[in-house]
Regions:
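Metallo-beta-lactamase
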Residues: 78-129
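Sterically constrained small-residue positions within well-ordered secondary structures
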Residues: 8, 67, 114-116
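Conserved beta-strand hairpin/beta-sheet module of binuclear metal-dependent hydrolase folds
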Residues: 1-41, 121-135
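Active-site metal-binding motif and surrounding structural segment of the metallo-beta-lactamase
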Residues: 32-78
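Structured catalytic core of nucleotide-sugar glycosyltransferases
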Residues: 6, 11-14, 57-58, 63, ...
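A generic structural signal for short beta-strands and their flanking turns/coil linkers
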Residues: 13, 22, 48-50, 72, ...
Length: 135
């Protein structure tokens, strides 16, 4: 399991997570050029990203989503409330509420969090005997 914070703060949040053969982003509040550059610094091509997990829909967590979808088309995981309040047309997405079992031997569950947004979630990623909580 590999974890790397690509950006954190009011100007944008984006985290890279690699589990087995799968490569994920948690949030994408940075523009495509910045995110691509940061991914390449850790030897990851943007097109290798399998999915993006959205914690909430504040701009500093989703600003780069539209362009990243256009360029790479990863699957987007978000709640129904997030999707309903997101002003983007997303075709490759999955709605979840509590547990996401989307990749072999990887269990992903969500934690409902309090924040001033229609919905906010943390994630727990479990693989083999390792786990990572992103809250």
């Amino acid at each position: 399991m590999k974890f790397c914070v690509l950006a954190s703060g009011s100007k944008g949040n984006c985290t890279y997570l690699e589990i087995g053969n799968y490569k994920f982003l948690i949030d994408i509040g940075t523009n495509f050029l910045y995110t691509s550059t940061k991914l390449k610094e850790i030897n990851v091509e943007p097109s290798e990203i399998n999915a993006i997990f959205i914690t909430h829909i504040h701009e500093d967590h989703i600003a780069g989503l539209k362009r990243f979808i256009k360029m790479c088309n990863p699957k987007i995981y978000l709640t129904k409330k997030m999707k309903d309040n997101l002003e983007l047309d997303i075709s490759n997405y999955e709605i979840y509420e509590e547990i996401i079992e989307c990749y072999e031997n990887i269990k992903i569950s969500t934690v409902k969090l309090s924040h001033d947004t229609p919905d906010c979630r943390g994630y727990i990623f479990e693989h083999e005997e390792k786990s990572l909580a992103y809250i």
